[in-house]
From Swiss-Prot:
Compartments where located: Cytoplasm
Organism: Coccidioides posadasii (strain C735) (Valley fever fungus)
Chief place of localization: cytoplasm
Family: Belongs to the aldolase class II family. MtnB subfamily.
Annotated Zn(2+) binding sites: 114, 116, 199
Protein name as it appears in the record: Methylthioribulose-1-phosphate dehydratase
Pathway, per record: Amino-acid biosynthesis; L-methionine biosynthesis via salvage pathway; L-methionine from S-methyl-5-thio-alpha-D-ribose 1-phosphate: step 2/6
Length: 237
């Protein structure tokens, strides 16, 4: 059996697009946007039968390729002890987001991103106040909506389409979000994101580039929605 603490060749590559190189670069970018402040958030990329995941509880802007965990895929979500790590950095903790990332990969994603964006948190509070706990985020007639897919193989949303993002309730522990996240995925099969009230958002895409640009588009829309609300401008026309 391969020793997961000595399988360093899995994260050594001169290719800047290799997941072990790309995850640290993405985390640095996300830090500048305020998405992964104070060790929060995370990023994971699937390449073939390997999943690369940023560690938990570390300064995301300081992550290096040697800090990346690698899982064999597919792998069980629960219990954590059953997950098939083929590389585990010493003295670092696996991401608490792991089962939620796995839920996205089980639906065909190539990359999953979790942020603690303030704009994402604020829209969950505004939706709760206006629509109650069962409401979802909805917005239309905004150009940036075109950056979000309609669903798998359905192309992109158009200007006149309505973007809908489900919202789930937060839990005391990250991993406990998994069941409600998967339920939201089932109820909104075309979604590429799930908001977590008072917490942040999970976004996934077919590739790292698509996940990143979708996350950027959503954050733009959330910030715009907060500003529109201040001005009394409705999100739905």
């Amino acid at each position: 059996m391969t020793d997961p603490e000595n399988n360093d060749q899995l994260v050594k590559s001169s290719d800047p697009e290799h997941p072990a190189n790309l995850i640290p670069e993405l985390c640095k970018k996300f830090y500048t946007l305020g998405w992964v402040t104070g060790t929060g958030g995370g990023t994971s990329i699937r390449r073939g039968d390997h999943i690369f995941i940023a560690p938990s509880g570390v300064q995301k802007e300081m992550i290096k390729s040697e800090d990346i965990f690698v899982l064999s895929y597919p792998t069980p979500k629960y219990p954590p002890s059953a997950r098939q790590y083929i590389r585990k950095p010493r003295e670092l903790k696996p991401s608490a987001c792991t089962p939620l990332f796995l839920a996205a990969f089980d639906r065909g994603a190539g990359c999953s991103i979790h942020t603690h964006s303030q704009w994402a948190v604020l829209v969950t509070l505004l939706v709760e106040r206006e629509k109650g706990k069962n409401g979802c985020f909805e917005i239309n007639n905004i150009e940036q909506i075109k950056g979000i897919p309609k669903g798998k193989g359905k192309g992109m949303l158009g200007y006149f389409d309505t973007l809908r993002i489900p919202i789930i309730e937060n839990t005391a522990f990250e991993e406990d979000l998994t069941e409600s996240l998967e339920q939201a995925m089932d109820e909104y099969p075309d979604t590429y994101a799930v908001l977590v009230r008072r917490h942040g958002i999970y976004v996934w895409g077919d590739t790292p580039a698509k996940a990143k640009t979708q996350c950027e588009s959503l954050d733009y829309l959330f910030q715009l929605a907060v500003e529109m609300h201040k001005l009394g401008i409705p999100w739905i026309q």
